[in-house]
């Protein structure tokens, strides 16, 4: 009886481990997204599903942290960091949900994941839409047993680097609290 329990636990553990392939994680989310994009118009329920897909796919806390210089991040107390992460997530999620046509693809080919240790991976996807290729690179981390992207590089343009440059410019003239207000207003604008 004890052996059967051990074998069952081992099988479940192996299945869970096998399910955590970073390429498979991206393919699954991409398939859901492509299904939603094929619809000519999306109702509010489907728009919310897109936002939930983004929440499930991205590590917004790490993306937010990497969107600031190490010094700017460390200079903030935990409450300010949390508020920044929450508003940043809202802004990125809302603006990404509005610009989804960029991710529409007739076909997609995924390269094998490039692993860095057991908890970091890079997955490159080649998307073709109407004969034009776009290359997306997902920089990923294993978070609570799930692969999540913390940066998306589209045709050599890094999301994290782009935000870092923008926020660095803003913080030259404004306080961190003012940066959070700017991000919050942008999130409100894109929510409509």
Locate the predicted segments by residue.
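Short loop or secondary-structure boundary microenvironments that flank
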Residues: 40, 114, 153-156
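Early exported N-terminus immediately downstream of N-terminal targeting peptides
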Residues: 20-99
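Sec-dependent N-terminal signal peptides
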Residues: 4-13
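Surface-exposed, charged secondary-structure patches
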Residues: 94-134, 186-192
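Low-complexity, intrinsically disordered terminal/linker segments enriched in charged
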Residues: 151-192
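Juxtamembrane/interface motifs at transmembrane-helix termini
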Residues: 65-70, 101-107, 169-171
């Amino acid at each position: 009886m004890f052996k059967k329990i051990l074998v069952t636990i081992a099988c479940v553990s192996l299945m869970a481990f096998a399910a955590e392939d970073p390429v498979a994680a991206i393919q699954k989310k991409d398939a859901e997204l492509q299904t939603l994009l094929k619809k000519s118009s999306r109702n509010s329920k489907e728009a919310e599903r897109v936002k939930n897909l983004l929440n499930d796919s991205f590590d917004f806390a790490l993306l937010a942290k990497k969107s600031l210089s190490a010094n700017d991040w460390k200079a903030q107390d935990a409450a300010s960091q949390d508020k920044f992460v929450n508003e940043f997530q809202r802004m990125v999620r809302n603006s990404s949900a509005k610009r989804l046509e960029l991710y529409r693809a007739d076909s997609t080919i995924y390269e094998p994941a490039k692993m860095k240790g057991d908890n970091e991976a890079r997955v490159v996807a080649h998307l073709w839409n109407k004969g034009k290729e776009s290359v997306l690179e997902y920089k990923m981390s294993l978070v609570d047993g799930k692969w999540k992207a913390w940066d998306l590089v589209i045709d050599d343009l890094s999301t994290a680097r782009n935000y870092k440059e923008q926020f660095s410019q803003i913080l030259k003239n404004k306080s961190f609290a003012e940066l959070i207000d700017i991000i919050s207003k942008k999130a409100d604008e894109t929510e409509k």
